[in-house]
Amino acid sequence: MGNIGFLLPLKVFVVVLCNFVTTLSEESPSTTTDQLALLALKAHVTHDPQNLLATNWTSATSVCNWIGVTCGSHHQRVTALNLSHMGLIGTIPPPLGNLSFLSELDIRFNHFHGLLSMELANLSSLKYINFGHNNFRGEIPSWFDSFTQLHSLLLYSNNFSGVIPSSLGSLSNLEKLILYDNDLKGQIPIAIGNLSKLKRLYLDNNQLSGQIPSAVFKCKALEFLSLTNNVLEGSVPQEIGNLTRLRYLYLDNNNLTGQLPSALFKCQELEELDLSQNALEGSVPQEIGNLTKVIWLHLYRNNLTGEIPATIGSLSVLRYLYSENNSLTGQLPLTLFKCQELEDLWLFDNALEGSVPQEIGNLTKLRWLGLNRNNLTGKIPATIGSLPVLDFLYLDCNSLTGRLPTLQPSLRGFSVSNNNLIGEIPSSVCNMSSLRYSLDLSRNNFHGIIPECLGNLSNSIAMVDLSMNSFHGKIPENFHKDCLLRLFGINDNKIEGSLPRSLVNCSKLEILDIGNNNLIDTFPIWLEKLDLQVLILRRNRFYDRIDNFEGKFSFTHLRIIDLSHNDFNGYLPTKFFENLQAIRSESENKDDPKYMKYSGTNRGYYIYESLFITIKGSEMELLKILNAWTIIDLSNNRFKGQIPEVVGELHSLIVLNLSHNSLSGPIPSILGNLSALESLDLSSNKLKGKIPAQLVNLKFLEVLNLSWNNLMGLIPRGKQFDTFTNDSYIGNLGLCGLPLSKECSNEQNLEPKPTKSGEDGDAVNWKYSILMGYGCGLVCGLSMGYIVFTTGKPWWLVRIIERVQQKYVIRGKIRRSGGRK
């Protein structure tokens, strides 16, 4: 025994040595393969902002110690590669396909680009792929079916195009398929229905078309399904009832039609349901009460009709209900106010009627309440003033009566415009220090004085609209030194006194409308440095000259100015027109104009929905004012002298009204350069000379009024001038030629020489042109007849408004609170 005792340590040494040699012989070549594959990837990275790969991925250290690399504990082969959120720019090289033990590949939130190399198909051990938020392009490779062990495929937010390959349907272990935010087209492949383990399917924000295949609803394990923002059509299949585990369903912003399928309400695990922005019709079924776990219910912008079912009261955990922009009728069901978890309730733009129940006071967690643009009647319940966390209350455009209740100080936005409310502004308004967005009491029957405290609130609130009531007294004098007002409207009241000079503190003020009151003051030159875009002083008692401009940058942002029906006098100030840079320059956003709005919240809303303008003697209201509108109305004052030549440099001007003044001299021929002009009214002045032939070049001109001046000579013909009637020229005894019955003498018959741009029509006989003009006028008249009859607006105004608003079609989607789970 003593002779062989020394053999035990020797045996241990031999075993360890053999294992080391075996490991070394097995590991080195394979480890080298992995290292070369990763070094090839490093070489294809053109930008490494944090130098993570540059300083860490070196041959001096084991690949298993490299950042983002995980190796197996036994064989020391690379099993996972995570380079997410590194800001890398580059491409994926073919050698990466040599990582034969790789099971997880995560390179999300980088800037990798190009096509996916086919050699990646060799990564047959992959279970998890995340290429999200990169710039890969091309079709999703059909060879993805090589990854038979794959349970998660995330290719979201890239530039993949083409169709979704049917081969993905063979990935029997797939649980997550996330392809949103790409450029995928075509139909959803039926083979998706083979994915029996699929739990999450996100195909939103692509261009997928056709109907939703019933096969999708064979994936009975689905918990998340999002097909948002595609061009899917047809009805929602009844097979959706198979998805009894479904928790989140987003089908919004498609072209889906038909009724809400009754089978949908078998999905009793639903927590979020979004069917908004489709063309769904019919009523909301009583079975909606089965969705007792739903938190987020979006049905807005469809064609839903009928009453809100009483069973909605069963949705005890409902927090967000958006069903606006439908045609829902009937009264607000009392059971709705059992949903005491409600935070957002939006039912505006429907046809709801009846009163707002006192039970609304039960919704103590309510933050947003939008019942505007319905047919609600009765008084505003006092309980609405006791909602402790209410931020936004919109009840405008109904038929509500009575007085305003005491309001919560927590309110940040409040509108009751377009109702039949009476009384004075309650003192509780002075305590609303949280107001940030809007205080809109316009178009009611309120009276009394405007509280001084509104001036103090101006350091927080963006919009105050008290227009079209019966307020009297003076405008508050105490606008805060840090005034944040963007809109201040008190037009159409009985306000007296002068404009408070503290308004100059409102450096962000864009819209000031004080028209149709009894204000007495001079022109507010002291507002010249503000960002005013709309200035309306019409129908007051403003007086004196407006030519005392000294600054170079006075009113440079003004696009709409209405000084009509005042007592201004003196000469039209050249300097004033020179400063109107917003009208002098061509519109930079002709193809993408915006409505004038203040988007201070995630819901967005218009801050100024109307103004009154005078065209051809008729006072009309324009709704939802476009940024493209440019209007100058100085009519019904006592201006004298000639029209400044600089007016012809206002290239974006659409409406110009200088009528009913004492202007003299000729009509400047440079007005023919106003290429956007659609309405020109110079009537009831003392203008003389001939009508410039250059005005024929105004191809959009719909309204021309030169009546009651001292003009003479032949009336120009051609283009829009062939459509104007006698009314445009009446009261000018020296004018002759069509459309007037007075013929011209030989001397008068010398037609003004046309400009170069008008010569293209000279080959046509002028009498024939006149006949064509009248013919076109007849056709247009017939086509517009229905609009005129139903709206009560003259055809010429309808055409001006429609042209401006149809030029600019705005289509956008407001994304609601909540997010992808």
Segments predicted by a language model, with ranges:
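Plant-biased, solvent-exposed loop and capping regions
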Residues: 1-821
